[in-house]
Amino acid sequence: LEKFGMKMLAVGDHGGYVMNEHGLKVSEIDEHVQKHGSLKGFYGPAYGYVRGVPIHKDEFFALETNVVIPAALEMQIGEEEAKHMKCDVIVEGANGPVTDKADEILKQRNITVVPDILANSGGVLVSYYEWLQNKQDVKWTEDDVLDKLDGKMAMCYTKVAKIAKEYDCTLREASFIYSLKSIEKVYQKRGIE
């Protein structure tokens, strides 16, 4: 996301939560976690500036920001977190990071949730591309794979967003509708009722 001009205000893991209002450097976070196994200790002066300050989990989920990406744990965002979140969009990078009750609260608060079924399906898609290359005995470059992935993910998001608008529902509900309609088409082609 850095390459698109976005800055990471905060990050958290089992070792704690860290914030820097000027933005955290992903490369430094990666280096620290590789060396220490968690974010624990990733704060204070380093490299000639303050990398970040430790914050509590409650502060983390109440930060005013555009996007929150829960990318590690299931049920990370429950009712309490949902009540206090100050973001426009949640992109589910993990499987099931938002509980059902939290999802309802976020819906009532007009916070858009890009569901896991849509947001984190890239790995499965790339596995399919790998299978396809092996099946066809061809080799794509990394750029080819990323281009295909970007195109497919954008197309799926566009279709799901259109369904959400058409049915006046959430992106999660629209993802399920899209999936069921896709299965229905296959059944119809095969003559299955």
Which residue stretches match the model-derived regions?
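Rossmann-fold NAD(P) dinucleotide-binding segment
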Residues: 55-65, 73-90
